[in-house]
């Protein structure tokens, strides 16, 4: 018996240790009304929320001050100097004190920092004093009127009832919207405010019996405002946890839910509650080895990620559930499968029979058992094996990664929804050692990268694959691939294919100007480039980075470690920040002139950055048809950003207001890295939903002639100042075939000449199928001013002849 008790005590101790270990997010006493476990993080969270409504607070104070000034004027309007009573003096004094308090608080809010003013005490003090002053002013003013039997004839639209309703509404909305107050405190203030106003009505109308309608109306207004409070509370990102409880209560058996969730896991003696992703319940963790997906990013409060604390864990559960279900229902699942459970291998577990069984109970028990013994990588691997392998197209094209002039944007590979996976595997797999597990990890990595490229007009998966293709071409042209071992070639190609992963379709300057959450996280320094690196290494951390290392390498083996490879990849991705363009070009120029310039060692990273930089803007050096299409796409993306910027200016949207984050015409929340978004894009890819094919993209900028007119001059400037010097630095690195001179630089010169021609005659730009719906095109067609040749069909000889004809027309005064 003693041994049994000792065992129980040891188990209890272990449980307490585990509870202490996994104690993190939600305090049990705030299970329905979530609070961060760490008090300091809760304070930071509230500061940021209040900071976001700074303007709202100032607007409220201004409106309230305006109302009180009107009241003060009314109170002093009937002030009779000859027979002034103490009541009249009190009315004016209380009104003036209220005005002064509003002015002081308004100045404090507007001019002082959040740390010194955005405290709960300030707001509670303001609310209490405002109500005291207001109560006394109205009471004494009404009492004075009753005593003198003098209605306010001079201001007939002003009466006591109207004043009550205005104050009640304005001050109640302020209380209900103020995030510094907790839910219960807001409700408490609201109820106290209601009682105070009912008392005031009774005191004001003490000699009248028919004031029930006023009480009824003010109570009805209170109900509406309380509904608004609940709605505001539920709409706050971190409080959406309650939605998931309601969902579980509605769709699951209530008694089972109550006994499992409340009876078993909502014990008063427990300090905190955590989320168990394995069994989709909110309970204590039992598995010591269990780990959350990116717990340091998604679960814990980190870098002011407002939507991460109380939302992503459930998104993660949904993602894992959907993946498992989508995997298990496949008919092609092997009927003879082994599953490792608690270290033991069980053979002949028939997935098909269990999943397609007509008895849901059997399926659920097997499903739960399966989930308990699979970690995140296993689940993703199962999904990958079941879904993706059947959809991968093996690339049988020797031109990808070798021929600079290959028309990738129009190829069948460029239009594939799995373009990153297919092209990346085609280019990287030759450098992977002959190991099936490593090749599988490579495919899984590319799948997740593919799923985090979003359907922007320009910065999409097609762009990522194109840059990888061009980077491989440049590695061959500059003989870079002969200096690197297989491990670093893998890193080089991974950096190129993931260099824009997660791109939201907005520039760094936009993120910085709008104080976007990413600009705060990365301190306005290479914001997106740092974000791309973060996503890349987060995925590598999940699935393991061992597939990067080729153990068959015979050179630079001592440098084949994760730290060096990580530094190499980060440097390559950061170099694509155009703000750092001249800095990287100058570094390469100086190193190239140095006597100890050595690509095989210290300068490998310098040449790599120049290669990937040129590949990133490499569409400028493609054939005109491909380059013109990419220009259309990048112009559309810039135009979309311009529209959003104008929207912010027109609406006077506070750049510090993060509440606009995730709305239409802003950066979509779905473009922030989490596993729910990976799953959504994953399903779109599996279902072959391609939203970034050039032929399907709608171009909105074509209807704005001023924007269209600016494109040629912008391109000419970009070619001359940015691209041309970059290519000339690489010319000295090309091999005997002179491909940079004969292909890259040649294409650039032709494209530059074409843009100069279009700059002088913008009508050429409109002669394309995409432009046929514009008013400008119709006008040109009506006046017969369109040239015979289409924009995308312009060839080298056409540029020469058109330039010659254009000069002759200018000479003869026809233009």
From Swiss-Prot:
UniProt-recorded Gene Ontology molecular function terms: 3',5'-cyclic-AMP phosphodiesterase activity; 3',5'-cyclic-GMP phosphodiesterase activity; 3',5'-cyclic-nucleotide phosphodiesterase activity; cAMP binding; metal ion binding
Record topological domains on the Cytoplasmic side: 1-56, 108-120, 182-183, 232-815
Cofactor list: a divalent metal cation
Transmembrane segments: 57-77, 87-107, 121-141, 161-181, 184-204, 211-231
Residues noted as binding a divalent metal cation 1 in the record, renumbered to the chain: 463, 499-500, 616
InterPro entries documented for this protein: HD/PDEase_dom, PDEase, PDEase_catalytic_dom, PDEase_catalytic_dom_sf, PDEase_CS
Cited SUPFAM superfamilies: HD-domain/PDEase-like
Knockout or disruption consequences: Impaired gametogenesis. Gametocytes are morphologically normal up to and including stage V of development; however, gametocytes fail to round up upon stimulation of gametogenesis with xanthurenic acid and levels of exflagellation are severely reduced. Higher levels of intracellular cGMP in stages III to V gametocytes.
Pathway: Purine metabolism; 3',5'-cyclic GMP degradation; GMP from 3',5'-cyclic GMP: step 1/1
Catalytic activity: 3',5'-cyclic GMP + H2O = GMP + H(+)
Main enzyme class: hydrolase
Co-factor remark: Binds 2 divalent metal cations per subunit. Site 1 may preferentially bind zinc ions, while site 2 has a preference for magnesium and/or manganese ions.
Active site: 459
Extracellular side: 78-86, 142-160, 205-210
EC numbers on record: 3.1.4.35
Limits of the PDEase domain: 384-762
Chain positions recorded as 3',5'-cyclic GMP binding sites: 459-463, 500, 616, 715
Record membrane topology: Multi-pass membrane protein
Glycosylated position list: 207
Keyword Metal-binding annotated: yes
Role this protein plays: Specifically hydrolyzes the second messenger cGMP, which is a key regulator of many important physiological processes. Probably by regulating cGMP levels, required for activation of gametogenesis.
Designated name of the protein: cGMP-specific 3',5'-cyclic phosphodiesterase delta
């Amino acid at each position: 018996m003693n041994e049994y008790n000792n065992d129980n005590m040891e188990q209890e101790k272990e449980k307490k240790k585990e509870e202490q270990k996994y104690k993190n997010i939600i305090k049990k006493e705030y299970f329905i009304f979530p609070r961060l476990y760490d008090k300091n993080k809760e304070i930071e969270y509230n500061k940021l929320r209040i900071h976001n409504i700074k303007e709202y607070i100032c607007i409220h104070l201004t409106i309230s001050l305006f109302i009180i000034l009107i009241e003060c004027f009314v109170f002093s309007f009937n002030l009779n100097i000859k027979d002034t009573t103490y009541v009249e003096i009190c009315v004016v004094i209380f009104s003036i004190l209220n005005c002064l308090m509003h002015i002081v608080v308004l100045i404090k809010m507007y001019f002082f920092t959040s740390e010194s003013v955005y405290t709960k005490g300030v707001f509670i003090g303001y609310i209490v004093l405002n109500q005291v002053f207001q109560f006394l002013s109205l009471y004494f003013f009404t009492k004075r009127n009753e005593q003198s039997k003098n209605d306010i004839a001079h201001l007939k639209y002003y009466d006591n009832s109207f004043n009550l309703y205005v104050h009640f509404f304005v001050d109640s909305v302020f209380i209900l919207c103020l995030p510094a107050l907790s839910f219960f405190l807001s409700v408490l203030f609201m109820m106290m405010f209601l009682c105070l106003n009912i008392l005031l009505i009774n005191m004001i109308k003490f000699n009248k019996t028919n004031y029930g309608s006023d009480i009824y109306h003010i109570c009805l207004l209170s109900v509406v405002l309380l509904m608004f409070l609940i709605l505001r509370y539920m709409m706050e990102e971190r409080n959406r946890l309650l939605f998931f409880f309601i969902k579980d209560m509605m769709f699951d058996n209530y008694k089972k839910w109550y006994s499992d969730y409340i009876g078993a896991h909502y014990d008063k003696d427990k300090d905190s509650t955590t989320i168990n992703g394995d069994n989709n319940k909110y309970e204590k963790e039992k598995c010591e080895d269990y780990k959350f997906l990116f717990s340091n990013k998604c679960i814990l409060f980190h870098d002011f990620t407002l939507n991460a604390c109380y939302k992503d864990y459930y998104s993660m559960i949904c993602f894992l559930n959907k993946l498992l279900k989508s995997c298990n229902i496949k008919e092609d699942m092997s009927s003879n499968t082994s599953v490792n459970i608690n270290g033991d291998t069980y053979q002949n577990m028939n997935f098909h029979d269990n999943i397609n069984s007509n008895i849901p109970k059997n399926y659920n028990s097997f499903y739960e058992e399966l989930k308990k013994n699979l970690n995140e990588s296993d689940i993703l691997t199962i999904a990958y094996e079941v879904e993706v392998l059947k959809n991968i197209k093996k690339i049988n094209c020797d031109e990808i990664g070798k021929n600079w002039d290959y028309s990738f944007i129009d190829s069948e590979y460029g239009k594939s929804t799995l373009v990153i996976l297919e092209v990346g595997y085609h280019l990287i797999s030759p450098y992977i050692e002959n190991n099936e597990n490593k090749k599988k990890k490579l495919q899984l990595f590319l799948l997740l990268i593919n799923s985090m490229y979003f359907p922007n007009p320009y910065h999409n998966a097609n762009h990522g694959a194109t840059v990888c293709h061009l980077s491989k071409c440049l590695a061959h042209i500059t003989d870079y691939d002969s200096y690197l071992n297989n491990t670093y070639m893998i890193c080089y190609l991974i950096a190129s294919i993931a260099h824009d992963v997660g791109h939201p379709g907005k520039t760094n300057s936009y993120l910085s100007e709008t104080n976007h959450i990413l600009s705060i996280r990365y301190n306005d320094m290479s914001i997106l480039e740092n974000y791309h690196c973060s996503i890349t290494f987060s995925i590598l951390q999940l699935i393991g980075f061992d597939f990067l290392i080729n153990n068959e390498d015979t050179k630079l083996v001592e440098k084949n470690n994760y730290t060096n490879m990580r530094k190499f990849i980060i440097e390559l991705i950061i170099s694509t920040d155009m703000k750092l363009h001249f800095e990287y070009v100058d570094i390469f120029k100086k190193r190239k002139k140095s006597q100890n310039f050595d690509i095989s060692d210290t300068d490998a990273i310098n040449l790599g950055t120049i290669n990937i930089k040129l590949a990133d803007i490499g569409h400028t050096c493609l054939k005109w048809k491909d380059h013109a299409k990419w220009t259309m796409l990048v112009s559309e993306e810039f135009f979309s950003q311009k529209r959003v910027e104008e929207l912010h200016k027109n609406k006077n949207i506070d750049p510090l207001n993060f509440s606009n984050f995730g709305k239409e015409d802003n950066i979509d929340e779905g473009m922030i890295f989490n596993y729910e978004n990976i799953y959504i894009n994953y399903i779109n890819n599996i279902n072959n939903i391609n939203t970034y094919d050039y032929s399907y993209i709608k171009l909105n900028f074509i209807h704005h002639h001023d924007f269209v007119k600016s494109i040629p001059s912008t391109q000419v400037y970009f070619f001359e100042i940015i691209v041309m010097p970059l290519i000339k630095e690489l010319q000295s690195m090309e091999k005997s075939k002179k491909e940079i001179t004969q292909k890259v630089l040649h294409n650039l010169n032709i494209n530059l000449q074409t843009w100069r021609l279009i700059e002088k005659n913008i009508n050429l730009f409109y002669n394309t199928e995409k432009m046929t719906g514009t008013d400008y095109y119709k006008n040109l067609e009506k006046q017969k001013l369109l040239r015979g040749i289409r924009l995308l069909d312009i060839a080298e000889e056409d540029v020469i002849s058109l330039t010659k004809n254009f000069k002759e027309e200018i000479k003869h005064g026809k233009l």
